[in-house]
Amino acid sequence: MSTQNSAYSAFSSLLAEAALPVSPAELHGHLLGRVCAGAGFDEAAWQHAAAELLGGAPGERLEAALSGLLGMVRQDFSAGEVAVVLLLPDDETPLAQRTEALGQWCQGFLAGFGLTAREGSLTGEAEEVLQDMAAIAQVQGQLEDSEDGETDYMEVMEYLRVAPLLLFAECGKPLEPAPKPSLH
């Protein structure tokens, strides 16, 4: 499965309860962008970045959910997966709303990536991925609600599941392996 539908619904509810104008897709994209740019998986740094994005410190339940989101992303990168899981609405959601969420995910990713300090310049391939994401962020509402529109959406979503891995390989901080037990 390429999306986390129940997680998306849960985050939507938490964000709506707190009257926050950020979508779950944008929040997840922001986290992945930070991680791929080299911010690593530090819990405190992520909570601080999320608080800035949300416009203030999150409540206890949202803070716990943000921690869980970080754990989900960490798992994607530590399991050696060939694609990441995107936090997007389920396939039953109208295409226009799913396309809007995909654009929000890209906007969040670009913001998270851009706000993270990194050394050196990017390869042409990495720059192309970021340009693709910027273009995808602009397509909101432009896909037809048809079989062709669904196919286009799925192709773009699959591309976005793989593209972050290229950026992570180039800029990301590798996960530190768990310490090996010592024998005494």
Curated annotation (Swiss-Prot):
Signal peptide extent: none
Regions crossing the membrane: none
SUPFAM superfamilies: YgfB-like
InterPro entries in the record: YgfB-like, YgfB-like_sf
A GO CC term assigned to this protein in UniProt: cytosol
Record family assignment: Belongs to the UPF0149 family.
HAMAP family per the UniProt record, alphabetical: UPF0149
Matching PANTHER family: UPF0149 PROTEIN YGFB
Protein name: UPF0149 protein PSPA7_5968
Species per Swiss-Prot/TrEMBL record: Pseudomonas paraeruginosa (strain DSM 24068 / PA7)
